Amino acid sequence: GGELFIELGYDRLDDRFLPTKGMYSQLKYTSSRESLGADLDFDQIEFSIYGNHTMGRHNILFGGVFNTTLDDDIPIYGIYTGGGFLNMSGYEQNSLLGANFGMVLAGYRYEVAQSGFLPGYVGTTLEYGNAAAKRKDIFSDGRVNGSVYFAYGTPLGPVYLGIGWSEDRSAVYFLRFGSVFGANSLGRR
């Protein structure tokens, strides 16, 4: 479709793969217009923020996402998705769908192996949010979920192995390679 957008970003994470300190934030406004080739006229706002703080071998993670559609009708390509590690970990990737999506998370990670070649971590997250047709339902009908995971920093990037859980379904197992922070992993599509 045809759209205009403006995007502002702030990235001070010390490591895109397994950050130990810093913050990442992104704000984006998108205006899709039929006159530019879009299927419908609609506007969307996306905001995300993640931060890390480390004390010795202990790391605290916090973050949130708020993506909203300002119009009632949107084409299927404008729908937001949630699910997957650190994006409503108790749900399969992209299994939560809606014109609006939001979540908050808090996490803890402990460095169990301090080898410079293959550092290893064990961590957990607690997450709350949802995808919904109406903006007001994102958090009022939110779902509690989280994860327990192992992470290893390899020369090819991090490997995450874990289990996600949610209040309304059984466990979701995951194996993930690569970045979970930064612009490539925080987008809506």
Give the residues covered by each predicted segment.
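C-terminal outer-membrane beta-barrel translocator/porin domains of Gram-negative envelope proteins
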Residues: 1-120, 124, 132, 175-182, ...
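Acidic/histidine-rich, metal-coordinating catalytic segments
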Residues: 127
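C-terminal beta-signal and terminal closure region of outer-membrane beta-barrel proteins
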Residues: 135-189
